[in-house]
Amino acid sequence: ALTALTPLAIDAYLPAIPQMASDLATSIHDTEISLSLYLAGFAIGQIFGGPFSDHFGRRAATGSGLSIFCVGTLGIIFSQDIHSVWLFRVIQAIGGGVAVVNAAAVIRDLSHGKDSARHLSNMAVIMMLAPLLAPLIGMIILHLSGWRLIFVFLLVYGLSIGTALFLRLPETRKKATERTSMFKRYAMVLSHRCALGFIFSQCFALAGMFAFITGSPSVYMGYFDISETVYPFLFGLNVIGMMLANRLNIRLLHYYRPQFLLSLGQAAQVLTSLILLSYVSLATEPNLVIMVILLILFIASMGLIVSNATSSTVEFFPQNSATATALLGSIGFAAGALSGSLVGLLGDGTPWPMVVIMFACALIGPLVRTMLQYGQPSPTHNHS
């Protein structure tokens, strides 16, 4: 439930963006900025939430983060202009970042190696169900009432999981007795070149995915003139593809190391984004079905990338797993905020800006990983 918090906060309101823009007397572009602001705020929350969790424990960090998330959500519900939405969206995101970073950290507290990768893959299935259902939930709520009720739903969800975790989440990380500063914890992770290779692999993969998430409303509902009712179903096809790839990843982990499967996912993203870029460049009028298929294949590759990059990274830092997870998330979501903003800034009413940025992200990820990891040792626990 905790891992679904951010996918719900990101995707549930996507069908409501045109209505929000009209209600707040602003443009769709300005309303879409709230998505990039959430990604940036989420990154900030993870930066501080990781070391906080490693020092004070998982329960304290989770409770604090969910409280901040609910305060920000309440502010959005009563906002009367887009600038207020931007402000409270950042507050909401910071709380989400502080809370969600604990999910992967708890898994690392209790497992490692291939076991950790399998547990993270199972967690990813839950994460993927959320963006599949979120636009549908948003669409239903939108037809019942208006966009504000979507954020009421998020508030109730945050309060519910906060109560459940308070009653049922055991403490898997005792309060640290040593005084290790946040900067020392991050310096430890940032000085590890092999770990950085995995971190930036996930970073650029997330950047490519958020370029799609940000650009998909204008591409599907604008360029291809798809209705608000059909859009969530097209969006959901990508999530189904990612879930299937994730289930495949769980099976393949019985035979292959996470690092190999990560490379396989990166290669798939490069290939599909290259085909997508070539098609958009050469086709006079791109066909919707072909575009949807290629986008599904690109997003599905995330099922092989995220959990394997995460498990490979945290293997190096058993005592600072939340800090490592926070760095993974914060850099990835910051890159997602940047790529999403670029899609918005370069938007020309065609799929071109979205597709170019997706290809660039897919290509840069494995290149940076290769440069950082050349001659470096890999994790040693993945045979277990």
Predicted segments — roles?
Residues 25, 57, 78-84, 95, ...:
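Helix-breaking motifs and short loop linkers at transmembrane-helix boundaries and internal kinks
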Residues 44-82:
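Conserved MFS/SLC helix-loop-helix module at the cytosolic interface between two early adjacent transmembrane helices
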Residues 68, 72-75, 83-91, 289-295:
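Paired small-residue
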Residues 84, 121-166:
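Helix-loop-helix hairpin linking two adjacent transmembrane segments in secondary transporters
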Residues 88-127:
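Cytoplasmic helix-loop-helix junction between adjacent transmembrane helices
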Residues 170-199:
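Juxtamembrane intracellular "pre-TM" segments in multi-pass secondary transporters
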Residues 311-349, 358:
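A late C-terminal transmembrane helix in Major Facilitator Superfamily
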